[in-house]
A protein has these predicted regions:
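An N-cap/entry alpha-helix motif that binds or orients negatively charged groups
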Residues: 4-54, 118
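Glycine/Thr-rich beta-alpha phosphate-binding loop at enzyme active sites
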Residues: 30, 37-48, 187-200, 243-298, ...
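Short beta-strand/loop segments at the ligand-binding rim of alpha/beta enzyme cores
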Residues: 59-66, 142-149, 214-234, 294-304
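Catalytic cores of alpha/beta
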Residues: 74-83, 234-248, 294, 298, ...
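Glycine-rich phosphate-binding active-site loops on the catalytic face of alpha/beta enzymes
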Residues: 87-99, 184-186, 253-261, 314-341
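A gly/proline- and charged-residue-enriched helix-loop-helix capping module
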Residues: 92-143
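C-terminal helical cap(s) of enzyme catalytic domains, especially alpha/beta-barrels
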Residues: 98-114, 263-278, 330-354
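Active-site glycine- and acidic-residue-rich loops that bind
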Residues: 154-167, 194-195, 200, 227-248
Length: 354
């Protein structure tokens, strides 16, 4: 199937404008997710890898491979994602109210680099719409894989009031999220990355943690696992400061890394936005993961993201210190059954990709 996708289907899709192709893929996955029998057949064909589950953040993941945030922005088709071999899906980024995102064109392919540049700007339907979609299509308690919710700040919200957006989305989606990821690292919402700095970070993360503990106590359940997604463009000194806050506040993990605003020498595109996929982000992400792993002596679980387009690239993330991985751009280039390939290779943790 990988050969058919890469040699027949992908060339057809890549003749379309990138966001149009994304919308076609979204429609196909929504249709698939609405047909449980089809999902079951695809899942059976896929031989979804579940024989070596990963226990992390108090959750059980069928395998080490997740779909990164940005694909299923509104939580509309996690059932289809599960059938394609993923061990978890991260939906979003979602904001309290829906927003259109940045003007088109805002998504660009770089086939020679197996990369994408995006400046989407958190286009989504809002947290209430996501709640309804998850409740209807893949309700908590009837899942075979965890669903994380990636929450962000609305474009119009001042940085000083950003915490209100994160807390609002948390409250709305707490009943359907298995874990939450705090996204303060996208380069496509003006000023968002400033939240990674000392002026905002501690108070923001403390407020979200406080809301989490308060809700858990009120409802008599365990708190949700909380993760933070960071940029690859931070200095190691900045990474140290962020990790220190996460450890102090007992956050459950970190996702490393988001897209980069840097460009490798010789890259043909001059488009602005976040670069994902390719060797440049793969190597930088590996460096950040390994730095965090060593700095924390492995005490802070890491989900590795960035430049995973092969079994070998996925293995590098695990070797660097990641407990699990997420893919997005590599999935676009390698096709719908790429997750299955990765999951089966990674179940042995260190043997199949050598």
């Amino acid at each position: 199937m990988g050969f058919i996708y890469e040699n027949i289907l992908r060339p057809i899709l890549f003749k379309m404008e990138p966001e149009q192709a994304h919308d076609r893929g979204r429609a196909a996955l929504m249709a698939m997710g609405a047909l449980p029998t089809i999902c079951k057949l695809i899942r059976r064909y896929n031989q979804v890898c579940e024989d070596n589950p990963v226990r992390l953040f108090g959750l059980e993941f069928p395998n080490r491979v997740g779909l990164a945030a940005g694909m299923d922005k509104d939580g509309e088709y996690p059932r289809a994602i599960e059938a394609l071999g993923f061990g978890h899906a991260e939906v979003g980024t979602v904001t309290p109210e829906g927003q259109l995102g940045n003007p088109r064109p805002r998504l660009f392919r770089l086939p020679e680099d197996k990369a994408l540049i995006n400046r989407m700007g958190f286009n989504n339907k809002g947290s209430e719409a996501m709640l309804n979609a998850l409740s209807k299509n893949y309700p908590k308690g009837k899942r075979r894989m965890p669903v994380g919710v990636n929450i962000g700040k609305a474009k119009i919200t001042p940085l000083e009031e950003a915490v209100n957006d994160y807390v609002a989305s948390f409250r709305t989606l707490a009943d359907q999220a298995d874990y939450f990821t705090i996204n303060i690292s996208s380069p496509n919402t003006q000023g968002l990355r400033d939240l990674q700095g000392a002026a905002y970070l501690y108070d923001l993360l403390q407020s979200i943690r406080g809301e989490n503990l308060s809700q858990a106590k009120k409802l008599g359940r365990d708190p949700h696992p909380l993760l933070l997604k960071i940029a690859p463009d931070l200095t190691f000194k900045e990474v140290d400061e962020i990790v220190g806050v996460l450890l102090e506040l007992n956050y459950d993990g970190i996702i490393a890394t988001n897209t980069t605003i840097q460009r490798p020498r010789g890259m043909s595109s001059t488009e602005k936005g976040g670069l994902s996929g390719g060797d440049f982000i793969r190597k930088r992400s590996n460096d950040v993961i390994n730095y965090i792993y060593k700095a924390t002596e492995g005490k802070l679980p890491i989900i590795g993201v960035g430049g995973i387009d092969s079994v070998e690239a996925a293995g590098e993330k695990i070797d660097a210190g990641a407990s699990m991985i997420q893919v997005y751009t590599g999935w676009i280039y390698r096709g719908p059954f790429f997750a299955r390939e990765l999951a089966h290779a990674l179940k042995s943790k260190g043997e199949d990709w050598i």
